[in-house]
Amino acid sequence: MDRTKIGFPAEDYQSAPLPFTTVTTKMKDGTYFKDFFETKLPLVSKSKVTDKRALGKKWYQDIMHLIPALGVKVGYMIYPSVGSMVLVARLFSLIFFVLTMYFIIKKLKAYQMIFTIISVTPVAIQFATSLSYDSYNYIAFAWLSATLINLAVELQENKEIQLKDFFLRIILPSIALYFSKANSRLLYLIVLAVFIVIVAKKLKLSLTKLQVLIGSGVLIGLGALVYIFRYHDQLRLVVSKFIYTFMEPYYSVLTTQVISGTSTAAIPAWFYPIQYGALILLFLSYTKEQVPRWFAWLGLLINLINLFGVLFKFAIDPAFTEHVITGPQGRYFTVFILLLAPILTLLAQKISVKSTGSWLRRIVLFVSLMALALNLGVTTLRSYYLHLPMDEYRSGIEHYIFK
């Protein structure tokens, strides 16, 4: 589409700060609706597109964008304007997200409430209406996570799992995850672990805790040695970047403002501790071990590998501005929280959280609904009226991890 017809750059405008001021000006001038919803945009030949990111490099990368792309196509058929295409595409993504997550959560044998609450947080709602791959990535990860949790529940109950049944249940979500974001594929480590445990049970093999600890320590040690050997010249610099990153008070690494082109704005800062507090209480309310302990610890390990792996990748890459908008974004980490329920169950056994009746569930639901109400309310007021439009863009560029 030729976006210059409505005053936008012809190329990838979401990576530049210009649209913020452009949109703000249009709102003040009263031309926003006319330009975005009434102005018809002509098609542009692929041969004239200089930003090749818009065309895609490999066919399988397009699978993640299939649903919003279909929405854009239908939106253009309805009316060839930016507003029509964006609204229909977001609607398609939202319907896809809601329906798939409903069936995923319905089939879960444990932690249904946790999956539900995390999936309706403001950052997840941004995934649900994303025009990018975020919705697909979240669903693919949640699907395979739920499948693995169900298998782990059966292992905890000492039910026999046939290898044929294992592969039949794991194949489709594994394929779906393969076409998602690269860091999400860390989940394959749990797939491998579950497979090994099933085979070991078939062969009647058993490992002691000491053997497991030694084996895990050796693997982690080898991984650390590889990084040290490969990046030894940069190690001190990277460590200092990590320290400054986690000490900086201004810019949160786990931000809800995941991309400059989000469909919603962040919730007010004062509400974060309330939301996190309710989520922590929900996690700690699960005291029954529903999956094996090795599964719980592996879920925690994968969260840590993902967190530090993503930060490490950005810390050592001097060309980060060429392929990211604001650096390490919340969407890289949020979906991994789904794997923390088992390990926090072990913690909950040490910290007792008791509730009478369904009061805890009601409180968590109330906080979640309030978060969504605030989130959508701020969005309705347009976030660029409430804070400096360049804040998010500048915070990514000036973040300590890039210095």
Where are these regions (language model features)?
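Transmembrane-helix signature of polytopic, membrane-embedded enzymes
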Residues: 80-83, 101-122
